[in-house]
A protein has these predicted regions:
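Extended oligomerization regions of viral-like shell subunits
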Residues: 40-41, 138-265, 269-271, 291
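Short helix/loop capping segments that flank catalytic or ligand/cofactor-binding pockets
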Residues: 55-58, 95-96, 175-178, 185, ...
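Beta-strand elements of well-folded, non-transmembrane domains
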Residues: 51, 90, 271-275
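Short intrinsically disordered coil segments
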Residues: 61-65, 101-104, 182-183, 220, ...
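Assembly/oligomerization interface modules of large self-assembling protein complexes
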Residues: 2-82, 149-150, 281-282
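Short beta-strands and strand-coil junctions in structured, solvent-facing domains, enriched
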Residues: 34-37, 94, 274-276
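A residue-level signal for conserved active-site and pocket-lining positions in enzyme catalytic cores
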Residues: 47, 107, 267
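Alpha-helical scaffold segments that mediate packing/assembly in large oligomeric complexes
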Residues: 73-76, 81-161, 206, 284-285, ...
């Protein structure tokens, strides 16, 4: 059971509440849903990366059998701490259930958005042992959306992998909704009433704000990605650490909050996560080019 420590005693955060926060974070993160998941020890772990598959061969009864020679390498996966501080009014201190509900409703989405944004390269990575999809090749889907998607999928196949998941941003969704065939019918939605993009080229599609990366001086505007998500691993250190204080001063974008003076308290939540992937198994989807 996680504990909310204060200067005036302690409030217990039930295990089921902590578990629900973690579960909803995973459900809110497209990257977490598509990637393989492992439990990560605090000191990190070395994981094997297979860069090529073993190739079998037909042989006659007495001939030598082919010896598989897959290309193997390793990567160090490190747990990096993600933290957020959320201020509350004192009325939540009088009602623990209201506090728990507020935590469950407010924390997961923000944690998930930051994680996805970091994986896509919108946010600077926390350390060298955290991979980002910004290393993957980008394919323009702005002018001929269908051909751009096929080019990205083909590149992944040529590299020896199989696409099994698209992640698009709201901006990418707009491009897909605007793609039409020669008769003017939408290509990527079942009906105009749905307004969603459930699948692309027969592959599962998910949406997250974190998949959008604004155009840079030498990089295109990124609106999504596609890849073989068996080549991506999310590691998490069990549990979410939560503590509370009513004697602190918070620096926010809007100014300074003195918790004691303003009759408030703040909850700090921390979780440790890691991410590793084989970027050759992924392609980014761009709205235009870098030029």
């Amino acid at each position: 059971m996680a504990e909310l420590k204060t200067g005036r005693g302690a409030i217990d955060l039930p295990t089921e509440v902590s578990s629900e926060i973690i579960q909803k974070t995973q459900e809110s993160s497209s990257v977490m849903q598509l990637s393989r998941s492992i439990t990560l020890p605090g000191r990190g772990i070395t994981i094997p990366v297979i860069a090529g598959d073993p190739e079998p061969a037909w042989v006659n009864e007495t001939e030598k059998k082919k010896v598989a020679d897959p290309q193997l390498s390793t990567k160090k996966m490190t747990a990096y701490k993600m933290a957020v501080i959320v201020p509350f009014s004192m009325e939540f201190r009088r009602d623990n259930s209201a506090l728990y509900n507020a935590l469950v409703n407010r924390l997961p989405l923000k944690l998930a958005e930051l994680f996805d944004a970091t994986v896509f390269g919108k946010v600077e990575k926390p350390g060298e042992n955290f991979d980002q999809l910004s290393a993957a090749t980008a394919y323009d889907i702005s002018k001929n959306t269908y051909d751009g998607l096929v080019a990205a999928d083909t590149a992944i196949a040529v590299a020896g992998y199989a696409s099994n998941g698209y992640v698009i941003s709201p901006q990418g969704k707009g491009i897909l909704l605007g793609a039409k065939d020669t008769t003017g019918r939408p290509l990527f939605i079942n009906s105009v009433a749905e307004g969603a993009v459930p699948m692309i080229l027969g592959t599962t599609t998910m949406q997250t704000k974190g998949a959008y990366v604004a155009k840079g001086a030498s990089t295109p505007e990124i609106v999504g990605a596609v890849g073989d998500w068996t080549q991506a691993v999310v590691g998490s250190v069990s549990g979410i650490q939560v503590s509370v204080s009513d004697q602190a001063t918070l620096d926010t974008s809007a100014g300074t909050i003195n918790l004691w003076q303003q009759n408030m308290f703040a909850v700090r939540a921390e979780i440790e996560l890691g991410f590793r992937c084989n970027t050759e198994a992924f392609a980014r989807l761009a709205n235009g080019t870098a030029a």
